[in-house]
Structure formats: structure tokens, C-alpha cells
């Protein structure tokens, strides 16, 4: 297979530093050690690592809006979750799944421009509507070369990581051929998500279909989706 470089940003180690840091240091550790490696991704989304003015829109506010746990909430109460993310097996599985997912396209003759793929696993805010809608796990792979996996760590969400990675890798491949546009239409979004979920279930089976496909109903629409 074509050489590729899978770069893991070990969030567990960074989260431990945040957990042990005083409250006035937590945001900078999160900003510069966990999010800075993904600066290009955030730039594509018009999100600055550092706000242009005090209290302004930045990577911390943006990630909180997307359902990621705020650095100010990373304290001793998150110790168990951080310990779950510390298992080397989880990171090894992630790397292997990224390689297998991308190689599936290379074997079909796709000539990919991106050779470096950077990823990390983030702690999701369990009270976020995004997290609730997604059964505690979700991802972001819309910018080629960068993948975020977000979850509330437990047996169910950890077991779902491979299928989530396959879904996000499909986005990573697709957007190497389609220019990213922040003004994406609902039609385009449905196509993107449908292709990604189809690929993920092709790799891991229909029983691994994500909740964003399998359990969307009128009550969910009115209670969670419309308020967002």
C-alpha cells in the first residue's frame, strides 16, 4: 500500500495535564497542546486558536458549541474517563482502522494527495444535544488530513470507535476531491453523510449503523435538532 503517516495526538496525556492544572491554566494547555496541532483544520472553519479580542470567538468556544467538554470542566471528576482513554489498545485500533479505511480507497485506484492523517480522541460533553443525539459518540473528519473523535468513554462508545473512524475517513477522502464550502446545502450534507455511513457499514456491518441514521424521529427532531 501507499505510504501514509498516521499522527496521533494523545489527548489522554494532555487531559491529565489539564486536570492537574490550576483553573487559570487549563484553557491555554487545551488551546496550545491539544488544538494547535489542528490549527489548519480550524482555520478552514474560520475558527482562530486565539480570539482576536478578549472573550471573543475562538477554538475553545467553537469546540464547546460542537459538544466537546470544556477545559474548565476537566478536573478530578474526569479522572476515570481520562484513564479509559489512556489504553494503548484504543489508540492502536484507531491507527489500524484509519490505515484500513484509507487503503480501501487506494486499492480501488484513488490517487490521494494527502499522506499525513492527524487524529485525536476528545472528551464529549454528556449534556450537549450533539452528544445526546449521537448516543455519546461522534466525529469530525470534513477537512482532509484531520480527524476528531469525540465520546463519553464507556464500553458502548469505545466499541463504536472503529465504525466512527471509517465514517470520518470517508469524509476525509471525499473532500480531497471536493472543495470545502461552509455554505453547504442540506442536499449536499445528506449525500456526504449517506456515503460515509454506507462505507462504515460496508466495513463493519449494518448492525453498527450510527444513531444519526437509525433513530431519528419526530420527537428527536422537535426536542433536540430544531433547538440547535
PLM features: residue spans?
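Membrane-interface helix caps and helix-loop-helix hairpins in membrane proteins
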Residues: 179-181
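Conserved alpha-helical "signature site"
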Residues: 224-228
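Post-HExxH zinc-binding segment in Zn-dependent metallohydrolases
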Residues: 6, 10, 14, 186-223
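N-terminal low-structure segments adjacent to metalloprotease catalytic domains
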Residues: 1-90
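Hydrophobic, aromatic-lined core segments that form the binding pocket/scaffold
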Residues: 141-146, 173, 195
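Active-site recognition of the HExxH zinc-binding catalytic motif
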Residues: 163-176
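Auxiliary, metal-adjacent structural segments of Zn-dependent hydrolase domains
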Residues: 82-143
Amino acid at each position: 500500500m501507499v505510504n501514509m503517516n498516521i499522527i496521533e495526538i494523545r489527548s489522554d496525556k494532555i487531559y491529565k495535564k489539564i486536570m492537574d492544572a490550576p483553573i487559570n491554566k487549563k484553557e491555554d494547555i487545551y488551546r496550545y497542546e491539544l488544538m494547535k496541532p489542528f490549527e489548519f483544520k480550524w482555520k478552514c472553519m474560520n475558527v482562530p486558536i486565539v480570539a482576536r479580542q478578549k472573550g471573543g470567538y475562538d477554538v475553545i468556544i467553537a469546540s464547546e458549541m460542537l459538544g466537546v467538554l470544556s477545559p474548565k470542566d476537566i478536573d478530578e471528576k474526569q479522572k476515570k474517563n481520562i484513564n479509559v482513554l489512556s489504553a494503548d489498545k484504543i489508540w492502536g485500533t484507531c491507527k489500524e482502522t484509519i490505515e484500513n479505511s484509507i487503503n480501501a480507497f487506494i486499492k480501488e485506484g484513488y490517487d490521494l494527495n494527502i499522506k499525513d492523517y492527524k487524529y485525536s480522541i476528545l472528551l464529549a460533553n454528556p449534556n450537549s444535544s450533539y452528544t445526546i443525539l449521537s448516543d455519546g459518540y461522534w466525529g469530525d473528519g470534513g477537512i482532509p488530513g484531520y480527524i476528531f473523535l469525540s465520546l463519553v468513554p464507556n464500553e458502548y462508545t469505545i466499541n463504536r470507535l472503529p465504525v466512527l473512524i471509517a465514517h470520518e475517513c470517508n469524509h476525509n477522502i471525499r473532500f480531497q476531491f471536493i472543495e470545502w464550502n461552509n455554505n453547504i446545502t442540506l442536499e449536499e450534507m445528506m449525500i456526504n453523510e449517506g456515503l460515509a455511513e454506507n462505507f462504515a457499514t460496508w466495513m463493519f456491518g449494518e448492525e453498527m449503523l450510527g444513531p444519526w441514521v437509525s433513530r431519528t424521529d419526530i420527537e428527536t427532531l422537535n426536542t433536540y435538532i430544531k433547538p440547535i
